[in-house]
């Protein structure tokens, strides 16, 4: 009987102890609803559809905070970040050592994971028919393969009737993180590319025509028959452009970019990632191993100064920025899959949250702790949800929706739920203590009886 009580007691205690600490995570205080704030930002076009959707959804919750994000490319975003003309930047490429020296104490906050597609316009060919290896892709962009029916392409696609047409190569004309990701992949799979062209946000292209932003390259491909180029997955869906299956790093499979294959490429990356305030240069999930890993996958980042006095003299802007980015990398992740981005894992969210807690304004923490404790719901699984192949165009104007009494009631109910949960936990602990006291008392009585 005593052993059984001890076992039950131990079980109850372990149940309480195993409640994850992340279940009740701290959060920064909400923006002051009585103060209007505009946050200016710029950078990568790669995550622009997602950032633009965040702008709208965050604006519904906090209509007094407006995000003005300019999709000018990672290169332009980094330049503006270094010159301190924007509040934060977005980039698909981590800062190089020289850029980190020019912008010291910059935090890298992962915001999403995406894939760069090899998109093409082949009249008469349906989506997903074309298969390409990294070496063939490199030779196309080197200008060595100039026809779609070149034996190097035809041998990878037996049974597919490829046209005897000149290939029109489309690439970025601006400094771009998408370019950095793409050419980093080419440098890994082609020694000739690595030696002749190399890696960067902007390179000397051996062949092709340029387009500004992912939007521009997508437009070139869509309007130019027999063209091929590289664009982020969301833009391929958005513009209904077919894209190729690319040979994986192991050489065992041709993999289409998808939620599952991009997630597979990022699987296992979290434990190896640095902290937000550390260098991210060289961090990559490009050409990650795995039978179903899409080889041209990447994190995309928000760049934020630890000292916000570098970019603003307004305390409300500083406080609102911290809250908004915290929302983007936690609650905002639920919007990622609808635009074909992979949400960041809870462990990666924590890197960003820990980084935000380092942010200072006027010598004090810009992270002001909220009075309530929020539940952080994990948002990524090993098999992400497959969504319909349609993506809304980026929003032109913010949709401002005033907070309703229902929203206020929801917040009060969440707070009440938290207190009820805490009360239940305290009651459980009290019950355990009573059981322990009973056991001790029974043991003492038994001991006294034996002595008598």
Language model segments and positions:
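Selective detector of the "anchor" transmembrane alpha-helix that sits immediately C-terminal
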Residues: 418-442
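Short, Lys/Arg-rich N-terminal segment immediately upstream of the first membrane anchor
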Residues: 1-2, 413, 451
């Amino acid at each position: 009987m005593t052993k059984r009580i001890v076992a039950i007691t131990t079980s109850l205690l372990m149940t309480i102890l195993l409640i994850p600490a992340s279940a009740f995570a701290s959060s920064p205080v909400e923006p002051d609803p009585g103060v209007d704030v505009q946050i200016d930002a710029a950078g990568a076009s790669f995550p622009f559809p997602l950032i633009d959707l965040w702008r709208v959804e965050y604006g519904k919750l906090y209509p007094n905070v407006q995000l003005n994000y300019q999709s000018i490319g990672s290169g332009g975003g980094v330049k503006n970040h270094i010159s301190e003309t924007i509040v934060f930047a977005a980039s698909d490429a981590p800062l190089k050592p020289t850029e980190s020296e020019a912008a010291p104490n910059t935090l890298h906050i992962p915001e999403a994971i995406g894939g760069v597609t090899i998109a093409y316009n082949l009249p008469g060919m349906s989506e997903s028919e074309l298969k390409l290896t990294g070496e063939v892709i490199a030779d196309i962009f080197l200008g060595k393969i100039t026809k779609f029916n070149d034996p190097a392409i035809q041998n990878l696609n037996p049974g597919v009737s490829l046209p005897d047409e000149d290939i029109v190569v489309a690439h970025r004309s601006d400094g771009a993180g998408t370019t950095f990701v793409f050419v980093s992949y080419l440098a890994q799979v082609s020694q000739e590319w690595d030696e002749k062209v190399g890696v960067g946000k902007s390179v000397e292209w051996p062949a092709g025509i340029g387009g500004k932003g992912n939007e521009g390259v997508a437009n070139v491909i869509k309007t130019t028959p027999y063209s091929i180029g590289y664009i982020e997955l969301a833009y391929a869906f958005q513009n209904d452009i077919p894209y190729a299956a690319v040979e994986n790093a192991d050489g065992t499979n041709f993999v289409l970019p998808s939620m599952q294959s991009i997630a597979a490429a990022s699987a296992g990356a979290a434990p190896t990632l640095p902290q937000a305030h550390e260098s991210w240069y060289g961090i990559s999930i490009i050409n990650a191993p795995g039978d179903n890993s899409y080889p041209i996958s990447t994190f995309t980042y928000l760049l934020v100064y630890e000292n916000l006095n570098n970019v603003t003299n307004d305390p409300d802007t500083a406080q609102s920025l911290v809250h908004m980015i915290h929302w983007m990398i936690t609650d905002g992740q639920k919007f990622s899959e609808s635009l074909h981005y992979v949400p960041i894992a809870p462990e990666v969210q924590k890197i960003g949250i820990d980084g935000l807690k380092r942010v200072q304004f006027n010598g004090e923490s810009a992270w002001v702790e909220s009075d309530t404790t929020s539940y952080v719901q994990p948002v990524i699984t090993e098999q992400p949800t497959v969504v319909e192949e349609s993506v809304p165009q980026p929003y032109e104007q913010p949709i401002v929706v005033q907070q309703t009494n229902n929203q206020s009631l929801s917040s009060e109910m969440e707070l009440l739920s938290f207190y009820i949960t805490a009360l239940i936990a305290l009651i459980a602990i009290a019950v355990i203590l009573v059981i322990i006291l009973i056991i001790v008392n029974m043991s003492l009585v038994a001991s006294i009886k034996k002595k008598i």
